[in-house]
Amino acid sequence: MLLRLVSNSWPQVILPPRPPKVLGLQAPRRARKRAEGTASSNVFSMFDQSQIQEFKESLALSPRLERNGMISAHCNLCLTGSSNSPASASQAFTIMDQNRDGFIDKEDLRDTFAALGRINVKNEELEAMVKEAPGPINFTVFLTMFGEKLKGTDPEETILHAFKVFDTEGKGFVKADVIKEKLMTQADRFSEEEVKQMFAAFPPDVCGNLDYRNLCYVITHGEEKD
């Protein structure tokens, strides 16, 4: 239901050019599926496979995800002139986060429904949607929930390809300095502060290398590899 709300509300909701608060994206160590509950999810059960695939492709190809760290970086590194679909994780989160406090809560959902013309949404329905998350719905939790639902249609190779361009030796790592230079000089340029936030979320190792394979796994699965 969250994704349906996003796709329906996009023409009616004007996003600010830059959100006032940027969250630090901390990848969950072992964000596990809510096994029995996922299939009948109030949040996701309304979407068919084609809608899910469209979301995944837009997540992989979006030219810029405004809100968070390395997810933004991945999208900025993808090919210029790619999909302009609004159904990206960050854009979706921004739409749902009506009060711009960095979290999606019951009142945010109520306001989003109201923007779509549905005024009298029952508290029980809103509470059921919120309770599907393991905790407060910040961007990390939001991304994890989508990652859990979207397993099976992961465009992981598409995402990896954007990074492999810079991995000339095929080691699975790219130099953080190279990524920083590209992000600050090409396409929708990052500021110095945005780059710092990105590396705070997914820091390079002591040699300055960034493990982009694990990053891509987090993007598409919502959790880190063992």
Curated annotation (Swiss-Prot):
GO molecular function, one term: calcium ion binding
InterPro entries in UniProt: EF-hand-dom_pair, EF_Hand_1_Ca_BS, EF_hand_dom, Myosin_RLC
Binding site for Ca(2+): D97, N99, D101, D108
UniProt keyword Calcium, yes or no: yes
Keyword Nucleotide-binding belongs to the record: no
Location of the EF-hand domain: 84-119, 154-189, 190-225
UniProt GO cellular component terms: cytoplasm; cytosol; mitochondrion
Keywords linked to the UniProt accession: Calcium, Metal-binding, Repeat
Highest taxon, organism lineage: Eukaryota
Stored PROSITE patterns: EF_HAND_1 (PS00018), EF_HAND_2 (PS50222)
Subunit structure: Myosin is a hexamer of 2 heavy chains and 4 light chains.
Alphabetical list of PANTHER family matching this protein: MYOSIN REGULATORY LIGHT CHAIN 2
Additional free-text comment from the UniProt record: This chain binds calcium.
Identification of the protein by name: Myosin regulatory light chain 10
Lineage, opening ranks: Eukaryota, Metazoa, Chordata, Craniata, Vertebrata
